[in-house]
Amino acid sequence: MNIFHGDAVPFAPADVNSFTGPARTKRLALDDVGVPVHVYRVEFEEGGRTNWHTHTGPQWLFIVDGRVRVQKWGEPAQEVSVGDAVVIHAGEKHWHGAAPGGRGAHIAVNVSATTDWLEPVSETDYKKK
């Protein structure tokens, strides 16, 4: 068993090549458990969101603060809140970020996955219901 204290790893500003608006990330899982698992806390201020992207493996989002908007390519955006979970399957083009008018945060768990970052989410698509 290993314990990683949340304050031991600082937040970093989100990569401007992969995010639009104010956001920050913190890697939470720092241990090799024999399976490539990446765990992050991602916090979005109002207007903050990822670019469209895909993963080569599954991703789980666990909403821990505020409201988060998620969208799969070709489908309407949906809003989720604290206590909700989202499962994104390998290869699904999607984005996630703060719901318009507020802030939000999630824990992201990526298993055996790399990320292919794509184009930014337009302001129109971000605000569209």
Region locations from a protein language model:
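Short proline/glycine- and basic residue-enriched helix-capping loop/turn segments at helix->loop/beta transitions
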Residues: 43
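A short beta-strand-loop-beta hairpin characteristic of the jelly-roll/cupin
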Residues: 49, 54-82, 92
